[in-house]
């Protein structure tokens, strides 16, 4: 029993406070940082407001310009499970001479006032046997050392699934955008070898591409490899109206 002289452990430790005058310290700091980040984000958005009047294509392949497709080769490859096979290696110049000759002379007349803005490597894959249920895989590299010798077969490690239409598309442009190549016909006429090495590969990457499947069996794949050139089209140098005054 407690008396007026007894020690009561609850004395001096009991108190009452109103929660509205107290806030969690962590919540205060987080709220301050959140407001600071919001102000910085709004200031950054204001600097980008002048760009709202411009339009860009989400997919550069579908952007402005004319797509000129040139089929390099078609062939059948057998791919074993859990492996990927090398299908494109630009260390050699196979398929280039015939393709570029046809491109320059027959398929598309290149003149001096036209530019190649971008080059896409397009690989279309189709199964040769019916009623097969699997997905295509692909991996590629663009910045390989010139002396690097790629393996013919590699194991599947973090591949990319091929998208719609079983088509794998790679932009070969350097520096994050198209690098215009002009005077193509004159450069090609002077020397084919110099044109490929000095003009084409100086502005675009040499790709290395592996393909495979997620099937548990060996599959036979029909490959169609092509280059798609994004040609910049200029307005014709001609009057808008034709008549006696022109």
Curated annotation (Swiss-Prot):
Major component of the virus occlusion bodies, which are large proteinaceous structures (polyhedra), that protect the virus from the outside environment for extended periods until they are ingested by insect larvae. Belongs to the polyhedrin family. The gene is PH. The keyword Transcription regulation does not apply. One of its GO terms (cellular component) is viral occlusion body. This is Polyhedrin. Keywords: Viral occlusion body. InterPro entries: Polyhedrin. It comes from the Viruses. Pfam families: Polyhedrin. The keyword Iron does not apply. GO terms for molecular function: structural molecule activity. The lineage of its organism: Viruses, Viruses incertae sedis, Naldaviricetes, Lefavirales, Baculoviridae.
């Amino acid at each position: 029993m407690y008396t007026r002289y007894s020690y009561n452990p609850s004395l001096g430790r009991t108190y009452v406070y109103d929660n509205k005058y107290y806030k969690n310290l962590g919540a205060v700091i987080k709220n301050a940082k959140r407001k600071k980040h919001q102000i910085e984000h709004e200031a950054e958005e204001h600097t980008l407001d002048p760009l709202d009047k411009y339009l860009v294509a989400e997919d550069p392949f579908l952007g402005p310009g004319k797509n000129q497709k040139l089929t390099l080769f078609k062939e059948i490859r057998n791919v074993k499970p859990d492996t990927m096979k090398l299908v494109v290696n630009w260390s050699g110049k196979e398929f280039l001479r015939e393709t570029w000759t046809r491109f320059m002379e027959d398929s598309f007349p290149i003149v001096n006032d036209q530019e190649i803005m971008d080059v896409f490597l397009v690989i279309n894959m189709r199964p040769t046997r019916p009623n097969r249920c699997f997905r295509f895989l692909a991996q590629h590299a663009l910045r390989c050392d010139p002396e690097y010798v790629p393996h013919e077969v590699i194991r599947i490690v973090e591949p990319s699934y091929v998208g719609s239409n079983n088509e794998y598309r790679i932009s070969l442009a350097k520096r994050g955008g198209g690098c215009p190549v002009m005077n193509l016909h004159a450069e090609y006429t002077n020397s084919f070898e110099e044109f490929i090495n000095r003009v084409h590969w100086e502005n675009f990457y040499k790709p290395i591409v592996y393909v495979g499947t997620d099937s548990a069996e060996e599959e036979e794949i029909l490959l169609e490899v092509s280059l798609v050139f994004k040609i910049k089209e200029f307005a014709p140098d001609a009057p808008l109206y034709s008549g006696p005054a022109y």
